[in-house]
UniProtKB/Swiss-Prot annotation:
Keyword flag Ribonucleoprotein: no
Keyword annotations of the record: Lyase, Magnesium, Metal-binding
Enzyme class: lyase
Chain positions of motif DDXXD motif: 87-91
Protein species of origin: Cyclocybe aegerita (Black poplar mushroom)
Binding site for Mg(2+) 2: D87
Protein name, entry field: Sesquiterpene synthase Agr9
GO molecular function, one term: metal ion binding
EC number in record: 4.2.3.-, 4.2.3.126
Length: 372
């Protein structure tokens, strides 16, 4: 007799979060434009393109940056799609391969007016084109440009470290893992785009309470993502990079016990976030208005990422809204067929990287879902 699948409950970490779902009115047009822009670089084969469209990272940007103007929504869509392509390419590489891809994308950001070499991985040209438009939206001396480049560099370095950990099967403690995850999640460069057009004073940006808000926003996003994606990552053998699995091993808990532990941890982060918002210093009426827009941007990122998790096909296929309502998940065995998007091999991905590619999919409640 086949054993019944493990069933567990997903907590609603944002049940009492003051910021509610908000979708930008510019979503349809920006999705059309950004999808066409991304596809113009031919990053995936036909199967991979289906996976890319199912994820709908344009929806993520339109939820996360929803309070902002059209230009930021479009830049946000492009940035999310760059993240996806970069992650897909580095996911099939070891540390050395990921480091080479990192060098390409960072050189493109730092030298956007330098033509990219013929035959180079397409992430370089994607980053170059994006950064010319993004940097042109603000003054050349805007602090947000420096913040973005610094944070994207930190992000790519952390992704390389994760790739090396993956190749070596490194098992980290939760605190050590969370420290890396804060960088590898890509939240900080995503938050940097929230600054564009606000001209925040450095005093406000670097204030300890503001720095804490960025870290707490990242933690809420990362922990929520780990809980929601655990079943999928477990089935794919990637649970070493998920806090649920790490807590299971650190504290000797079962899956639900580990999720409950993380729920309590996230509740503390949530309380600290609200405390920092309530006790932010004043820098005068005009600056305070811009600071509020920035804080709303961070908070909307937390809310928007959670909404996107269930509204896109990234983690739950077409059952996301059902899972969001019932909060019940089942962990079932992996199948051998992959629905994951794949980097297009010919002319884009070096053959030496392709050997690291892993095919997998799984079933939740009898339906296929896209692998992370």
């Amino acid at each position: 007799m086949t054993a019944a699948p493990l069933t567990f409950t997903l907590p609603d970490l944002l049940a009492n979060f003051p910021w509610k779902r908000n979708l930008s009115e510019y979503y349809p047009e920006c999705k059309t434009e950004s999808s066409a822009w991304t596809e113009s670089f031919h990053p995936f084969d036909d199967e991979g393109l289906k996976g890319f469209n199912l994820c709908d990272f344009n929806l993520l940007a339109s939820l996360a940056y929803s309070p902002r103007e059209r230009e930021i929504i479009r830049l946000g869509c492009d940035l999310m799609n760059i993240f996806y392509v970069f992650d897909e390419y580095t996911d099939i590489a070891d540390g050395d391969g990921a480091d080479k891809i990192r060098d390409i994308i960072m050189d493109a950001f730092r030298n956007p007016h330098k033509p990219r070499p013929e035959g180079e991985l397409l992430v370089g040209e994607m980053a170059r084109d994006f950064w010319i438009r993004a940097s042109g939206y603000v003054s050349p001396d805007a602090h947000c440009l420096t913040h973005f480049l610094r944070d994207f560099d930190t992000y790519t370095a952390a992704v390389v470290r994760e790739a090396d950990d993956r190749a070596k099967r490194v098992y980290r403690t939760f605190e050590d893992y969370l420290s890396i995850r804060r960088d590898s999640s890509g939240c900080l460069p995503s938050f940097a785009l929230c600054e564009f057009g606000l001209d925040l004073p450095e005093e406000a940006y670097h204030h300890p309470r503001m720095a804490a808000l960025r870290e707490q926003s990242t933690d809420l996003i990362a922990i929520g993502n780990d809980i929601d994606s655990y079943a999928m990552e477990k089935a794919r053998g990637l649970e070493l990079h998920n806090s649920v699995e790490l807590i299971i091993n650190e504290h000797g808990l079962d899956v639900q016990g580990a999720i409950n532990w993380l729920e309590r941890y996230a509740a503390g982060v949530h309380a600290s976030f609200l405390d920092n918002v309530a006790n932010m210093p004043s820098w005068g009426e005009d600056v305070d208005r811009r600071v509020k827009m920035y804080i709303d941007g961070l908070a909307q990122w937390v809310r928007g990422n959670d909404d996107w998790t269930f509204e896109s096909g990234r983690y739950f296929g077409d059952k996301g809204l059902e899972v969001q309502k019932t909060r019940v998940m089942s962990l079932l065995p992996a199948s051998k067929v992959s629905l994951r998007s794949r980097p297009k091999a010919v002319g884009h991905v070096p053959k030496k990287l392709l050997r690291y590619f892993r095919y997998s999919t799984m079933y939740f409640f009898g339906f296929h879902v896209l692998a992370k």
